[in-house]
Amino acid sequence: MSKAQRMRIKLKSFDYKLLDQSARKIVETAKSTGAEVSGPVPLPTDREVITIIRAPHKYKDSREQFEIKTHKRLIDIIKPTQKTVDALMRVELPAGVDIEIKLKEV
């Protein structure tokens, strides 16, 4: 990897505990290869509320609400090496965590 690159990792999950464990694992892996790590930075939580009517016909005043929260974290790896990229490709993450990796020229 070139020294003028930065790796930006975005993590998303419905469970914040899984998200924090995954972020910790990624940071430890990157630091063990000698890369500089910035983060994890907590990003704003997305909250989606869904309202449905409880009864199938009338009684519109009787409603139920469900919500789902999406927690997000951001990790920047400054000056990643090829060893860092290889180590991050081998990291095992839980099934409930979505990861997005972008390489960015600085």
Curated annotation (Swiss-Prot):
SUPFAM superfamilies: Ribosomal protein S10 (SSF54999)
Keyword list, A-Z: Ribonucleoprotein, Ribosomal protein
GO terms under biological process: translation
InterPro entries from the UniProt entry: Ribosomal_uS10, Ribosomal_uS10_CS, Ribosomal_uS10_dom, Ribosomal_uS10_dom_sf
Gene3D superfamilies: Ribosomal protein S10 domain (3.30.70.600)
GO cellular component: ribonucleoprotein complex; ribosome
One function term, GO molecular function aspect: tRNA binding
PROSITE patterns: RIBOSOMAL_S10 (PS00361)
Similarity section: Belongs to the universal ribosomal protein uS10 family.
Biological role: Involved in the binding of tRNA to the ribosomes.
Quaternary state and interactors: Part of the 30S ribosomal subunit.
The protein, known as: Small ribosomal subunit protein uS10
Species of the source: Caldicellulosiruptor saccharolyticus (strain ATCC 43494 / DSM 8903 / Tp8T 6331)
